A protein has these predicted regions:
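Compositionally biased terminal segments of proteins
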Residues: 1-188
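Conserved phosphate-binding loops in N-terminal lobes of ATP-dependent enzymes
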Residues: 200
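Short, intrinsically disordered C-terminal tails of secreted or membrane-associated proteins
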Residues: 211-213
Length: 215
């Protein structure tokens, strides 16, 4: 199968529409998250990066498969990337706590909390979507070496923070990446126990699986 190299707004809205119909908790991140905050598309996007309630992820994967998507990177329960001729989706399961916060499993004992208060509304082609706040989208990029598209997005986030597109963005030299992208994904052997639990869990049981592993 030939996979798309970009993910257009129409495909993003199709996926967000499915999530909305399921009344599930989600959060758009990455470049599409930034453009949703800006209110217009400012560049092409390779994928849709999205946090999703872990209990809905199996149904989402099944639905995406029905539309021709197939896994290209499967690190569940941490993340799964799927691709098709329509686009690419990078799904990050998160356990939703009673207060609305989402908790995502990382490698080894790492867990990441995505606060409910860090979600806000943006728009893609005029359609409302749930995205991370500008501050949160900036925080989510702190652990990576910035690529050219990241520099573009960070500039937009700086201008949003400063209240207008005419403001000068923060210098790239002041942002110190914590880890390279590859360094963030070196401990793949530690997925074995989590993957076994994840695969054994029935539909709707993935959240319990993550909690069992200390989330």
């Amino acid at each position: 199968m030939v996979h798309a190299s970009t993910t257009p707004a129409s495909e993003v809205l199709t996926i967000i529409g499915w999530l909305t119909e399921k009344e599930t908790v989600y959060q758009v991140n990455g470049g599409w998250g930034v453009d949703a905050l800006v209110g217009r598309q400012t560049r092409e996007h390779g994928d849709l990066d999205v946090f999703v309630d872990a209990d809905v992820v199996p149904d989402l994967i099944e639905w995406l498969a029905s539309r021709g998507y197939e896994p290209v990177t499967d690190w569940l329960p941490i993340r799964i990337e799927l691709a098709s001729e329509h686009g690419r989706v990078d799904v990050h399961p998160m356990v939703i706590r009673p207060n609305g916060d989402g908790v995502q499993q990382g490698f080894e004992d790492a867990v990441f909390t995505h606060p409910a208060v860090a979600r806000t509304r943006g728009s893609i082609d005029g359609v409302p979507v749930i995205v991370g706040t500008a501050e949160r989208l900036r925080e989510l990029r702190n652990g990576y070496d910035p690529r050219p598209e990241d520099e573009h997005d960070l500039e937009l986030l700086s201008r949003l923070r400063d209240g207008g597109a005419d403001q000068q963005p923060e210098s790239a030299s002041t942002r110190k990446p914590v880890l390279s992208r590859m360094e963030c994904y070196t401990n793949l052997d530690n997925l074995a126990g989590l993957r076994g639990c994840w695969n054994a869990a029935g539909a709707g049981g993935r959240g319990r699986c993550l909690r069992r592993h200390g989330v």
